[in-house]
């Protein structure tokens, strides 16, 4: 997805 934020830290 283009609107994908980094949710994996």
Curated annotation (Swiss-Prot):
UniProt entry tagged with the keyword RNA-binding? no
**Name used for this protein in its record:** Allophycocyanin beta chain
Biological function = Light-harvesting photosynthetic bile pigment-protein from the phycobiliprotein complex. Allophycocyanin has a maximum absorption at approximately 650 to 653 nanometers.
For this chain, the Swiss-Prot or TrEMBL PTM comment says: Contains one covalently linked phycocyanobilin chromophore.
Oligomeric form and interacting partners: Heterodimer of an alpha and a beta chain.
What are the top taxonomic ranks of the organism? Answer: Bacteria, Bacillati, Cyanobacteriota, Cyanophyceae, Nostocales
Task: Report the membrane topology from the UniProt record.
Answer: Peripheral membrane protein
Major site of localization recorded for this protein:
membrane
Provide the Gene Ontology terms for cellular component: phycobilisome; plasma membrane-derived thylakoid membrane
